[in-house]
């Protein structure tokens, strides 16, 4: 049973409490899920249906922005096509701070109705988009606010670099398809929270949505091959505010 006095991690982040050790543990959990389900035919067969994922993620997040913001239509439509074609591992598709309960025994992950067998890059982009949007909110403390995102990516990437690593990651090391597509998912998910159907209400300064759009526009060019580059880029943009 979950502790009655548990906290939701999202609330901590919004309040400016940044604990990188939570991000570290979550990175280990997600890496284990992705690694453990790779090549698992039984899981693949049970979770192959992407209907709910499409209805709750691709359509209101990616397609809506592509339709209402024509400047992003080409990269987003391309990303949608590539995402639906991938069948790499179990993808939770709702791995976010609002679904992380902090208990006396550590973080507990809940609520994955959007789970399916697909593109692990979506989980990475979706999760990091939440952390980086909270960083924009707390821009005056950018180095502390962005630390959980850096730690999450470092630990996740390290966990999947252990030999033998999943084939989809091995391909990524030769040509960084996985990492680059994760960056595209990061951009698409951040755009969805400022221009999609489900917008965040905590970016209250007028310049913040525009900064997010400019940042995501840069990421969608495809010229960034490493996630840490994208994270540091946002850090530098915020340091200039």
Protein language model features and the residues they cover:
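ATP/Mg2+ or Mg2+-diphosphate-binding catalytic cores
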Residues: 140-143, 189-241
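Active-site activation/catalytic loop segments of kinase-like enzymes and analogous catalytic loops
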Residues: 121-171, 186-204
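Active-site catalytic-loop/activation-segment of kinase and kinase-like phosphoryl-transfer enzymes
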Residues: 33-82
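Residue-level preference for long, well-ordered alpha-helices that form the structural scaffold
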Residues: 15-22, 50, 65-68, 141-145, ...
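Surface-exposed helix-capping loop/turn segments at secondary-structure junctions
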Residues: 35-46, 159-178
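Active-site acidic catalytic loop and adjacent metal/ATP-binding pocket
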Residues: 77-122
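ATP-binding pocket architecture of kinase catalytic cores
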Residues: 1-42
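Alpha-helical scaffolds flanking conserved acidic
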Residues: 178-188
């Amino acid at each position: 049973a979950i502790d009655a006095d548990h906290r939701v991690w999202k609330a901590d982040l919004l309040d400016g409490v940044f604990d990188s050790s939570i991000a570290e543990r979550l990175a280990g959990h997600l890496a284990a899920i992705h690694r453990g389900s790779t090549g698992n035919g039984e899981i693949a067969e049970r979770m192959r249906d992407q209907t709910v994922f499409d209805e709750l993620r691709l359509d209101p997040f990616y397609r809506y922005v592509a339709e209402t913001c024509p400047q992003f239509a080409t990269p987003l439509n391309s990303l949608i096509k590539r995402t639906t074609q991938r069948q790499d591992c179990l993808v939770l598709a709702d791995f976010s701070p609002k679904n992380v309960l902090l208990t006396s025994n550590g973080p507990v992950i809940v609520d994955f109705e959007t789970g399916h067998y697909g593109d692990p890059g979506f989980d990475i982009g979706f999760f990091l988009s939440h952390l980086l949007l909270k960083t924009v909110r707390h821009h005056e403390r950018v180095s502390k606010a962005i630390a959980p995102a850096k730690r999450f990516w470092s630990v996740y990437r390290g966990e999947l670099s252990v030999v033998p690593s999943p084939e989809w990651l091995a391909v990524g090391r030769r040509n960084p398809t996985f990492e680059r597509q994760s960056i595209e998912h990061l951009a698409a998910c951040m755009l969805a929270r400022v221009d999609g159907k489900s917008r965040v209400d905590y970016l209250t300064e007028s310049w913040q949505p525009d900064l997010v759009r400019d940042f995501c526009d840069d990421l969608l060019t495809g010229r960034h091959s490493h996630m840490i580059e994208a994270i540091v880029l946002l850090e530098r943009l915020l340091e200039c505010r």
